[in-house]
Design a protein with these regions (language model features):
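Alpha-helical support elements that line or immediately flank enzyme active sites
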Residues: 1-6
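C-terminal substrate-binding/catalytic lobe of Rossmann-fold NAD(P)-dependent oxidoreductases
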Residues: 9-10, 15-144
């Protein structure tokens, strides 16, 4: 939706997600010192394949996005904090309107849209692949865009 609306010059995402079953519950030895830390007690920075995966699904974005992940002590639900440099100037109102329209039309049932002050637990059992959070949209100097 963003690429169709304003074009994406480049971008960076931080995926924040629940720890996974292969992480230890207590600090332990591991070749990756981050991965050896207690999953239920720490926010753990790690790598992500999400940026590369987007390039596979949307070839026009291949090589334009990079990112990192942070695993957090929650049982489920993830969030993506995406920042892009838009190819043209925009504002919060335009971004939110496009995302709302997409959630009601071409991405109905796939993309959710909310303006409620929801946190991760509120999305348990939500059937949408992703939910756009209206009050988290920020635009700086017209082209630096941040969405969640």
């Amino acid at each position: 939706v963003l690429n169709d609306l304003v074009g994406i010059e480049t971008g960076f995402m931080t995926t924040i997600h629940a720890y996974t079953g292969d992480q230890p519950t207590l600090d332990t030895m591991h070749k990756d010192l981050y991965r050896g830390r207690a999953a239920a007690m720490s926010m753990i920075p790690t790598s992500t394949g999400a940026a590369k995966a987007i390039g596979l699904v949307l070839p026009e974005l291949k090589g334009k996005l990079d990112g990192v992940a942070i695993r957090v002590p929650t049982p489920n639900v993830s969030v993506v904090d995406l920042k892009i440099i838009a190819k043209r100037a925009t504002d919060v109102k335009e971004i939110n309107a496009a995302m709302k329209r997409a959630s009601e039309q071409q991405l109905k049932g796939i993309l959710g849209y909310t303006n409620a002050p929801n946190v991760s637990i509120d999305f348990n059992h939500d059937s949408h692949s992703s939910t756009f959070h209206e009050d988290q949209t920020k635009v700086q100097n017209g082209t630096l865009v941040r969405v969640m």
